[in-house]
Amino acid sequence: MPNFEQNQVIAVGLSGGVDSSVAALVLKEKGYEVIGLFMQNWETDSKDPFCTAEQDLSDAKAIADHIGIPLYVVNFSKAYWNHVFQHCLDEFAQGRTPNPDVWCNREIKFKSLLDHAKKLGATHLATGHYACIQNENNEYRLLKSNDSHKDQSYFLHLLNQYQLANSVFPIGGYQKSEVRAIAKKRGFINHAKKDSTGICFIGERKFKDFLNEFLLAKPGNIETSEGKIIGKHDGIMFYTVGQRKGLHIGGRPDAGEAPWYVVDKDVKRNVLIVVQGYEHPLLYSQELTCTNLHWIRDTEPSFPLTCKAKTRCRQADQTCVVTRLDNDHCHVQFEHPQRAITRGQSVVFYLGNECLGGGIIN
């Protein structure tokens, strides 16, 4: 984390979780003037049993009081709906699998929230992300966290130079275990609070039930890769490539007991295509194309580019060669076949510890 002048005001996005809480504490103990910002991105009924926003706000207030910083509540639900949620609905409707966290970081946390922090007099916005920012002659690099298991650079790959220049990740150099230990030692009420998982606006409710509230499901056939109908699906928007659960196919006399997996979605025919066995060859691909390219540095890399890539956040880095197709498309050739490459997800590129940027798999 860079050293700033002691009289600078830094705003911290306090979510009620342990990571942002310790991020605020680290800044406070370094002598900065810290203010907390709690985002409300989703309008919910206070009686909604699946929404944790009320408890999260209560935890954020308790932490702010404990540390001794002011906390402001800001509502970005309209911006979130327009710039994140509507985009996700469009992607689901077209049979793709979007990543809301990627868009939320670019459009809400490091845009709307950063702008709000500036209006309050803050010079920078800090969050509890596990990532690092390095300034090299006023060019900002996004680096992986010291905790490889918690690294979140994948979700931050759409950030630009302005956003990185005005952001701080105070716990990027910490291990998650260290963060929890600090929180416990300081008596934070959320020191053992579990990490949030899944899609933020769905919470713990069933994905299918939630999506049904906004999109019209169209049931259709489930076919094998040979074109044989073996079942019915509830709507292809509910499924993603590599998925096993929820197919309700089971073992078949003519196919044995090996489980079935989604291998593709034929949107035009409204057909879900499946194959049998986790290691089925059709679940693997050695190449992909991507669009909506974004490079974090102002100058994009030279092509063809030999680097590492991830097609999902917890995947180990994979060696690949990236080739420019046009201004907005790249071809990615992997050294080894990759399982369950999914349209709508992000492919993110790395050179060593540096996140270069990425694109959307299509």
UniProtKB/Swiss-Prot annotation:
The gene is mnmA. One of its GO terms (cellular component) is cytoplasm. Disulfide bonds join C104-C200. GO terms for molecular function: ATP binding; tRNA binding; tRNA-uridine 2-sulfurtransferase activity. Its EC number is 2.8.1.13. It comes from the Bacteria. HAMAP family: tRNA_thiouridyl_MnmA. It is found in: Cytoplasm. NCBIfam families: PRK00143.1, trmU. SUPFAM superfamilies: Adenine nucleotide alpha hydrolases-like (SSF52402). Belongs to the MnmA/TRMU family. The keyword Zinc does not apply. Signal peptide: none annotated. Catalyzes the 2-thiolation of uridine at the wobble position (U34) of tRNA, leading to the formation of s(2)U34. GO terms for biological process: tRNA wobble position uridine thiolation. PANTHER family: MITOCHONDRIAL TRNA-SPECIFIC 2-THIOURIDYLASE 1 (PTHR11933:SF5), TRNA 5-METHYLAMINOMETHYL-2-THIOURIDYLATE -METHYLTRANSFERASE (PTHR11933). It catalyses: S-sulfanyl-L-cysteinyl-[protein] + uridine(34) in tRNA + AH2 + ATP = 2-thiouridine(34) in tRNA + L-cysteinyl-[protein] + A + AMP + diphosphate + H(+). It is an enzyme of class 2 (transferase). Pfam families: tRNA_Me_trans, tRNA_Me_trans_C, tRNA_Me_trans_M. The record marks H129, Q345 as: Interaction with tRNA. This is tRNA-specific 2-thiouridylase MnmA. Residues 99-101 are annotated as: Interaction with target base in tRNA. Gene3D superfamilies: Adenine nucleotide alpha hydrolases-like domains (2.30.30.280), HUPs (3.40.50.620), Translation factors (2.40.30.10). The keyword Acetylation does not apply.
